[in-house]
Amino acid sequence: MKTYNIVACLMLAFSFVACEKSTDTSTEEIKTSVVSDYTVFMQNNNQLNAVVVNSTGEEIIVENTLASFNDVPSNSLKYRTTLDISYFYTSNCQSNFQWYDASSETTKSIPLFEDLDSCELNVIATAHSSESGFIAYERELLGKDKQFVVRVNSLDQTTASYSEITLDKKPIDIIASGDRLFVLTLDEYVTDNYYLSVIDLDTDIIIMELDLGVDALRLFTNNSGKVIVSYPKLHTTIDPLTLDKEYTTYGENTEPGFITTNDYYMDAAGKLYFHKNMPSAAVTEVPAIYDFEKNSTVVYLFENFLTETELDIKYNIAETTAIAYDDKNNYVLIGYKKNGSADEGGILRITPSPDFKLIDNLDLEGVPQTIFVK
């Protein structure tokens, strides 16, 4: 079995660690003895639905469906944290914001933009806190330049209160940390540079704008709430209070690649679980883990812990679509799509590096998009 540990640091050094590749002998599945529950958001027939999956120690099964979570298109804008997730979507020119708290198993759904025509808006990015939803959008104004706005909408279902902050540049991404909102913007008319607008949520005032240069493409937060600005070849870590910056540069061919992931999970130790594009692998979208403290990436190629028969026939894996970590059992959960079907997938559970043992698999009538561990 062969795996790779890619180390990137400010000195641009890197190293590789490998072990033997899996043979075509069937991999033994190891059963767990600790009960775990997972909430899995899946795509099926262009809609999202959610199920509760239970692991009893003897088997892993779908226990029930979340009846309160439905009618959400699969192409909705998604924003997730460790504990909750929200979706923004527009249907028949009506906008909605649906939020799910995995810790309390509660769902809220609120209408948005009832004062505007949703079909005339281009919503670019969304985020949320425990109290508010944040929606960055642009709209055309007759005879004027485009208007760029962030709307702050209460998640209280009994009130429709909101406020708006006008931006002078196009919003690209948005993220909340503490009592501040961070908006990645692009000056598309003059410099093509990216900027970070810092908004005080107590006053809805932009208190600072940072010049990020070119190719600042995405925002994340780490386990301590610091803001991660992701570039193709590096990332910048920003303290949300002091706005102090730290720079991390990757060596050649050691880029983690989390800038393109559709799903991710940050654990308590500061490791980012994501899926990475590997064009030369048997499955090109694969699980990976980036350790911010060690500045290293472990890439999980399917052919290194599954046999060819398991990969192509038994599990029939086309690509990684979701990822999570079960800290009770020390398992990596890999959601995947099956070959030949748009609406069939499953979840593999494996032990992380250096063991790489297959625990079990669950086939699903849908393609996992996000997994929460209870």
Give short role names for the model-derived ranges:
Residues 243, 247-344:
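Intrinsically disordered, low-complexity segments enriched in Gly and acidic/Ser/Thr residues
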Residues 44-55, 92-101, 142-152, 190-198, ...:
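Structural motif
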Residues 46-146:
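Post-signal peptide N-terminal segment of secreted/secretory-pathway proteins
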Residues 58-75, 106-118, 158-165, 203-211, ...:
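A short beta-strand motif characteristic of beta-propeller blades
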Residues 164-249:
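Solenoidal tandem-repeat scaffolds enriched in leucines and small polar residues
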Residues 25-29, 70-84, 116-130, 164-178, ...:
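Repeated scaffold domains used in trafficking and secretory/extracellular systems
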Residues 31-45, 80-92, 131-142, 179-188, ...:
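Short beta-strand elements that form the blades of beta-propeller/WD-repeat-like
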